[in-house]
Amino acid sequence: MYYGLDIGGTKIELAVFNEELEKLYSERVPTPKTDYEEWLNTIVDLVNRADEKFGEVGTVGLGVPGFVNQQTGLAEITNIRVADNKPILRDLSVRLGREVRAENDANCFALSEAWDTENQQYPTVLGLILGTGFGGGFVLNGKVHSGQVGMAGELGHLQLNYHALKLLGWDNAPIYQCGCGNKACLDNYLSGRGFEMLYRDLKGETLSAREIIDLFYQGNESAVDFVNLFVELAAISIGNIITAFDPHMIVLGGGLSNFDYLYEALPKALPPHLMRTAKVPPIKKAKHGDSGGVRGAAALFLTK
């Protein structure tokens, strides 16, 4: 059996999959906040219960909101302070008596989608998450591309470029401070949170993403104008990412990926922001929803 764990700031989910990546079982527990040993033991207990339930020793893959530095072995997951800067793979492997692997949760999401039968025709798949934050993962020939250190795909920390700042009004452009220490990171613009903050600062009204989208479909002038601007901002930024990766397919996840208008508007908005010979790849909605992260984490032992 293949176990995938989604390690979040508020909950830890374990799911069990077979070789066809069909989910057979799942369990969620709260994430311990203050004690590292308790955090480790919570994961160990989840895995041991799965072993007992299925009568075998399963493989263990983790999806984390950050990455494990491949050179130092230390986790860089600042929003889970209890495990940040800790050798989580070593400590879990010792306690579980087996190898444990980890990848960024966006990489796991991309891997899950890339492994679907209908998507295996694409040699390269770019996964973009437009959720609480903005991030990405890149799958090459069925395997996650992690980079030298393990931080490949940290696309949320690319910054607004010339065209994006011009679109937002230069000196009047909202410039948001990022948790990474820099300013104007895409994480604060292309995420669901960024969608709401931009509407507030550009339109002077505080609304949820759902409320903005509802107004858009009702033909509200302010919402329509804002959504068109957001699509253009996304096209500028994703266009740069396409230029860097030239993917065969893009899959969108996270809350904003449920905004169906994006799949109509983005392919039309992208060409001016690409090189003349570039091709806009198919842009698809994620198939597995909230299960994508654990499914991709489980798949780490099918692909390495």
Swiss-Prot record:
Judging by the UniProt lineage, the source's domain of life is Bacteria
Q: Which NCBIfam families match?
A: PRK13310.1 (NF009835)
Its job: Catalyzes the phosphorylation of N-acetyl-D-glucosamine (GlcNAc) derived from cell-wall degradation, yielding GlcNAc-6-P.
Query: Which InterPro entries does the entry link to?
Result: ATPase_NBD, N-acetyl-D-glucosamine_kinase, ROK, ROK_cs
> What is the name of the gene encoding this protein?
nagK
Q: Which organism is it from?
A: Haemophilus influenzae (strain 86-028NP)
Going by the UniProt record, its keywords in alphabetical order are: ATP-binding, Carbohydrate metabolism, Kinase, Metal-binding, Nucleotide-binding, Transferase, Zinc
Gene Ontology BP annotations: N-acetylglucosamine metabolic process; peptidoglycan turnover
Stated family = Belongs to the ROK (NagC/XylR) family. NagK subfamily.
**Enzyme class name:** transferase
Q: What is the lineage of its organism?
A: Bacteria, Pseudomonadati, Pseudomonadota, Gammaproteobacteria, Pasteurellales
PANTHER family the record matches:
N-ACETYL-D-GLUCOSAMINE KINASE, ROK (REPRESSOR, ORF, KINASE) FAMILY
Could you tell me what this protein is called? N-acetyl-D-glucosamine kinase
